[in-house]
């Protein structure tokens, strides 16, 4: 997944609709993104085009252990539920966002139903210096936590992302693959290289 930074912001049409946290929406609006809309956890927004629609539901996420999480901006995961007609069964894609493994994730399949695939933000992001220091604050799932999330959410297919963009990542993609393999789940991993596409 891309990170919101000055480069990404410069390249975006200011009229593009953005669904985000209630914390981020007013900040984006002040930067000229008038269509930014903040939603609370478990709220959703639906966008339709003809008979097709996608419903985006805000899901629980936490960027750091309590009480440190209060010092960081809130994060959210997203359930994307795609339908092509009133009769078609919805297809659900879970996007974790930059969260740790938290108990609230267990509510997701209960509230949202069976999930078809997931995109997990991994990397074991550790501030301030990744693996360069023997200590730090971990703010995203590492390979082991990602594997646990796959099991708890019942994800039949999973695409790991967000693991090698910056020097603060402490858990490469191979950590996740090794952890999934150790639990007999290697066949669920979809390795997606930059610039490539995959059909799920």
Which residues fall in each region the model found?
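Generic recognition of short, well-ordered alpha-helical segments
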Residues: 7, 31, 170-174
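Cap/insert and terminal regions of metallo-dependent hydrolase folds
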Residues: 17, 23-26, 100-194
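Short active-site oxyanion
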Residues: 12-18, 91-93
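Helix-loop-beta element that forms the nucleotide-linked donor phosphate-binding surface
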Residues: 28-40
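Core dinuclear metal-dependent hydrolase active-site scaffold
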Residues: 39-113, 194-200
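Di-metal (Zn2+ and/or Mg2+/Mn2+) metal-binding site signature of metallo-dependent hydrolases
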Residues: 1-13, 22-27, 105
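Metabolite-binding pocket within alpha/beta catalytic cores that recognizes anionic/polar moieties
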Residues: 8, 15, 32-35
């Amino acid at each position: 997944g891309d990170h919101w930074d000055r480069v990404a912001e410069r390249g975006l049409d200011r009229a593009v609709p953005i669904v985000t946290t209630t914390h981020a929406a007013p900040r984006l609006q002040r930067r000229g993104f008038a269509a930014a809309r903040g939603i609370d956890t478990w709220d959703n927004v639906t966008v339709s085009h003809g008979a097709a629609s996608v419903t985006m539901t805000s899901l629980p996420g936490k960027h750091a252990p309590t009480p440190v999480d209060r010092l960081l901006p809130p994060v959210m995961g997203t359930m994307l539920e795609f339908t092509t007609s009133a009769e078609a069964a919805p297809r659900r894609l879970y996007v974790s966002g930059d969260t740790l493994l938290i108990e609230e994730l267990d509510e997701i399949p209960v509230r949202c139903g069976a999930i078809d695939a997931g995109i997990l933000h991994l990397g074991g992001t550790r501030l301030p210096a990744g693996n360069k220091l023997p200590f730090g604050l971990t703010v995203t799932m590492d390979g082991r936590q990602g594997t646990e999330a796959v099991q708890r959410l019942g994800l039949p297919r999973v695409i790991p992302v967000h693991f090698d963009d910056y020097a603060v990542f402490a858990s490469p993609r191979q950590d996740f693959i090794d952890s999934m393999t150790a639990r007999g789940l290697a066949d669920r991993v979809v390795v997606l290289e930059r610039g490539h596409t995959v059909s799920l």
